[in-house]
């Protein structure tokens, strides 16, 4: 029998749609449902490569893990990776079809609906429930023509909708009631309930507020979910993680907060480790005296390299390396550490830029993107992180540029680089690095075990906060 859909929409970006969908995936899995996530179109710089070499958004990877499934590109058939404020690289079913301006994509997206529906139907044939995530708000009225991700998709699938609002940012009545009021009658009929998300304090104090929401919107409030902090990947660019500025206790890790920073989930193992603090640095005044400098991945290597130079951070990084402070580049950050980055075909912004000159390599962007999972053993390193020699790793690569043949991790003195995202996730990698920098010994817990424990905790919290029985009735009967 074909899967039944349920859709999570939100009043705005960062209302909590992604984690709500993940929580519902795990809660339904616990009850024996075969469940899969689906988001027709995702805009994100954080992405992932599946085992068969396709690129997709990390939010759907998190939801797939919560559902107990392997990541499948059909769960996110369209991924937009911003390259500028008005343009993105467009990825369809895991492969790039080129860069487009917002205007070009708006005209192009109507062609994508057949591919989106084919992906959805394939998942629906293999599962009992599909948990669909919308994007942004369903009432961006100027963008609703040819909608493929919110109510346009919900109507096509006759999917019941749960609408999530973020009370932490204020205006919950305007958010939820305003959104419901701006929907068409047909769209409004699909909304089966409201969820108040990120409530701080005693939830019982909102009981009267919930009644007011129901009276004003005509929709039942199916739950008030408390504000929580769990160790689960959060891909949204508004993530609070990026706001960390001050030095904490223990080993001080300074990650450069690049304008087009991607895959910042790479650094979660350092964030969760005791005896280590991670801060995200975007200006010289924040640089301080770190024990480790990390240049992260980016969707626009040359432009972000120019950002480091124009603001003076490049000088700080080079000076730190000359003082013996370890510097570690990942993917685009790795490319920046070399002598030169060239983009002759305009894959990102075009042109070329001198690198920081800390590693003996040059990067040239070709037309083909490298997308692959990878695993192996680290070897051949010298210096402070020679402790990683013999350490097994698994991860994935997503990059346009090629920098010649080299090992998974390379170094020159105290400067290190890798193309492998997720390399710090394996038990022992981050712990050994922290210990090498004089930090307290960290637990060698594998990141995957941490995730599994947190998915269970997420489902427990969700069940305690919502009317799960009513949600199941909505899924089963659409009421």
In which residue ranges do the predicted regions lie?
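Flexible phosphate-sensing "switch/lid" loops adjacent to ATP/NTP-binding sites
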Residues: 1-319, 326, 343, 367, ...
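Catalytic nucleophile serine of serine hydrolases
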Residues: 331-332
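A Zn2+-metalloprotease active-site environment signal
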Residues: 335
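A conserved active-site-flanking secondary-structure segment within enzyme catalytic domains
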Residues: 338-390
């Amino acid at each position: 029998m074909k899967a039944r859909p349920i859709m999570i929409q939100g009043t705005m970006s960062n209302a909590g749609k992604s984690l709500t969908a993940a929580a519902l995936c795990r809660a339904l899995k616990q009850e024996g449902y075969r469940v899969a996530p689906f988001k027709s179109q995702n805009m994100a710089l954080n992405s992932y490569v599946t085992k068969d070499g396709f690129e997709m958004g990390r939010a759907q990877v998190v939801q797939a893990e919560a559902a107990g499934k392997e990541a499948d590109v059909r769960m996110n058939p369209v991924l937009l990776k911003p390259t500028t404020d008005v343009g993105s690289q467009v990825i369809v079913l895991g492969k790039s079809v080129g860069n487009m301006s917002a205007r070009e994509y708006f005209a192009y997206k109507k062609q994508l609906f057949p591919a989106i529906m084919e992906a959805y139907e394939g998942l629906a044939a293999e599962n009992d429930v599909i948990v669909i995530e919308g994007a942004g708000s369903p009432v961006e009225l100027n963008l609703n023509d040819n909608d493929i991700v919110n109510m346009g998709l919900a109507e096509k699938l006759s999917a019941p909708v749960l609408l999530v609002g973020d009370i932490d940012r204020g205006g919950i009545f305007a958010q939820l009631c305003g959104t419901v009021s701006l929907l068409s009658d047909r769209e409004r009929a699909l909304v089966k309930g409201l969820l108040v998300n990120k409530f701080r304090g005693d939830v019982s104090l909102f009981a009267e507020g919930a009644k007011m929401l129901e009276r004003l919107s005509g929709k039942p409030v199916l739950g008030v979910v408390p504000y929580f902090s769990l160790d689960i990947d959060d891909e949204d660019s508004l993530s609070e993680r990026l706001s960390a500025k001050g030095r904490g206790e223990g080993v001080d890790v300074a990650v450069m907060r690049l304008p087009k920073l991607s895959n910042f989930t790479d650094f979660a193992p350092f964030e969760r480790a005791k005896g280590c603090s991670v801060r995200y640095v975007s200006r010289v005044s924040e640089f301080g005296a770190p024990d480790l400098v990390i240049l992260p991945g980016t969707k626009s290597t040359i432009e972000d390299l120019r950002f480091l130079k124009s603001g003076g951070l490049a000088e700080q990084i080079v000076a730190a390396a000359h003082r013996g402070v370890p510097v570690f580049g990942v993917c685009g950050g790795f490319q920046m550490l070399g002598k030169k980055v060239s983009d002759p075909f305009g894959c990102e912004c075009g042109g070329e830029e001198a690198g920081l000159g800390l590693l003996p390599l040059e990067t040239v962007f070709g037309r083909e993107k490298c997308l692959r999972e990878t695993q192996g053993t680290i070897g051949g390193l010298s210096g402070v992180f020679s402790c990683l020699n013999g350490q097994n790793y698994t991860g994935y690569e997503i990059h346009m540029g090629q920098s010649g043949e080299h090992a998974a991790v390379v170094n020159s003195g105290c400067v290190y680089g890798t193309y492998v995202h997720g390399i710090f996730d394996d038990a022992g990698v981050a712990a050994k690095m922290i210990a090498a920098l004089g930090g307290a010994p960290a637990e060698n817990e594998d990141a995957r075990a941490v995730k599994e424990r947190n998915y269970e905790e997420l489902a427990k919290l969700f069940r305690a906060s919502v009317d799960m029985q009513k949600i199941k009735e909505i899924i089963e009967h659409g009421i």
